[in-house]
Amino acid sequence: MIARVWRGSTRAEDADEYAAYLEETGMETARALRGSRGTLVLRRSHGGQAEFETILLFDSLENIRAFAGDDIEAAVFFPEDDRYLVEREPTVRHFEVDVNVT
């Protein structure tokens, strides 16, 4: 299993709305794909901002390509992201999942 990890930040006052938007766009899209093993959205507030870390779990790199396209290192953005994000990583990190306890 492979974890796809991305980070971005919103203004604190936009955090709840962005979390709902993120769920409706990226998270639902990822979970609907073959080979998806689930998603996590982590949030923490600090300095007037809310930092989001997303973790998408996939069976293989081919499954990630179905979500991200050929450049699997590039982050995937949706139309309203510019409205919310004050900071964002343009790339993602991929990790092999060594331990999965459910």
What are these regions (language model features)?
Residues 2-9, 38-71:
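Short, well-ordered beta-strand segments in beta-rich or mixed alpha/beta enzyme
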Residues 12, 58-60, 96-99:
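Non-catalytic surface loops within mature trypsin-like serine protease
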Residues 12-38, 76-81:
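Short amphipathic alpha-helical segments
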Residues 16-18, 64-66, 102:
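Short acidic, gly/pro-rich beta-turn/loop elements at beta-sheet edges
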Residues 23, 31, 65-68, 86:
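Alpha-helix boundary recognition
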Residues 40-50, 76-102:
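Glycine-rich beta-strand-turn "strand-cap" elements at beta-sheet edges
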